[in-house]
Swiss-Prot record:
<comment type="similarity">
    <text>Belongs to the ATPase gamma chain family.</text>
</comment>
<keyword id="KW-0406">Ion transport</keyword>
<keyword id="KW-0375">Hydrogen ion transport</keyword>
<keyword id="KW-0139">CF(1)</keyword>
<comment type="subunit">
    <text>F-type ATPases have 2 components, CF(1) - the catalytic core - and CF(0) - the membrane proton channel. CF(1) has five subunits: alpha(3), beta(3), gamma(1), delta(1), epsilon(1). CF(0) has three main subunits: a, b and c.</text>
</comment>
<keyword id="KW-0997">Cell inner membrane</keyword>
<dbReference type="GO" id="GO:0046933">
    <property type="term" value="F:proton-transporting ATP synthase activity, rotational mechanism"/>
</dbReference>
<dbReference type="GO" id="GO:0005886">
    <property type="term" value="C:plasma membrane"/>
</dbReference>
<keyword id="KW-0813">Transport</keyword>
<dbReference type="InterPro" id="IPR000131">
    <property type="entry name" value="ATP_synth_F1_gsu"/>
</dbReference>
<dbReference type="InterPro" id="IPR023632">
    <property type="entry name" value="ATP_synth_F1_gsu_CS"/>
</dbReference>
<keyword id="KW-1003">Cell membrane</keyword>
<protein>
    <recommendedName>
        <fullName>ATP synthase gamma chain</fullName>
    </recommendedName>
</protein>
<dbReference type="GO" id="GO:0042777">
    <property type="term" value="P:proton motive force-driven plasma membrane ATP synthesis"/>
</dbReference>
<dbReference type="Pfam" id="PF00231">
    <property type="entry name" value="ATP-synt"/>
</dbReference>
<keyword id="KW-0472">Membrane</keyword>
<dbReference type="GO" id="GO:0005524">
    <property type="term" value="F:ATP binding"/>
</dbReference>
Length: 287
């Protein structure tokens, strides 16, 4: 049986760990509220921009913009969005495994498939397993629209320079604190959502022309999609960490209970042993 001293030391250690996990849960809860607000604000904007692109692209040729042209040379880029920090359950590992499944299942469709990682954890997981084109490991330390725009511009330029012909992004979409959905989307070539057929749809007069507006809005669309994906990932990360730390705190409390019971039993056994020794000593003196 473990000594009283070692059991007490373990109880103190687990209590300290429990305090840390509880504090991390509270920090993640506060950050989650802000991140969730950002996601809720970004989704309608992204949806409306897609709706506008759908109207603009109606009756337009597929080659009306370089970003809509489909090429068949077979070079592709997969953007993998993870976090910079761990302690968030299977948040990063599950997404990286999904990225590897994509490479395995669809890799044969492309002559070259490279990966761009956003987030340190994704890079660390994939760097020795897949072809990494580039890693952005400090994006989340100061995430803003300008950062996403710079990422988008690099991706767009690579597409225009025909370094790759298709661009996909995989990330964790936020659903709730307990639920994050791994989501795969195609960024390039842009395929605007089809505008809904309306019996009495208004006829818009565009100034400047539709093609000019598409030329301006398509890069903006890529920027918004990447920014929204990053915001979704941040909210999902905090939700996953909050859940993981809550589970860790409960496990710590449960372990403290078991160790306390073990400590009390060991202490009781030690006291009983001492009493038996005293009684035996007294009996031997009498004898």
């Amino acid at each position: 049986m473990a000594s009283l001293k070692s059991i007490k030391k373990r109880i103190v250690s687990v209590k300290n760990t429990g305090q840390i996990t509880k504090a991390m849960k509270m920090v993640s809860a506060a950050k989650l509220r802000r991140a969730q607000e950002n996601v809720v604000a970004a989704r309608p904007y992204a949806a409306k921009l897609g709706e506008v692109l759908g109207r603009l692209s109606r009756n337009q040729d597929a080659d009306s913009s370089p970003l809509m042209i489909k090429r068949t040379t077979g070079k592709a880029l997969l953007i993998v969005v993870t976090s910079d920090r761990g302690l968030c359950g299977g948040f990063n590992a599950n997404l990286c495994k999904a990225a590897e499944r994509f490479v395995k299942e669809r890799g044969a469709e492309f002559t070259d498939l490279s990966i761009m990682t956003i987030g340190r954890k994704g890079y660390e997981f994939l760097k020795n397993r897949q072809k990494i084109r580039k890693n952005f490991g400090t994006v989340f330390s100061n995430l803003n629209y300008q950062t996403a725009a710079l990422l988008a511009q690099e991706v767009i330029q690579g597409y225009l320079d025909e370094e790759f012909d298709e661009v996909f992004i995989i990330y964790n979409a936020f659903r709730s604190v307990m639920s994050q959905d791994i989501t795969l989307e195609q960024l390039l070539p842009v395929t605007p959502p089809e505008a809904a057929d309306e019996e009495y749809a208004p006829e818009y007069i565009y100034e400047p022309s539709k093609s000019e507006l598409l030329g301006e809005l398509l890069p903006k669309h890529i920027e918004v999609q990447i920014f929204k994906s990053l915001l979704e990932s941040v909210a999902s990360e905090h939700g996953a960490r909050m859940t993981a730390m809550d589970s860790a705190s409960k496990n710590a409390n449960e372990m403290i209970g078991k160790l306390t019971l073990q400590y009390n039993r060991a202490r009781q056994a030690a006291i009983t042993t001492e009493l038996m020794e005293i009684i035996s000593g007294a009996e031997s003196i009498k004898g």
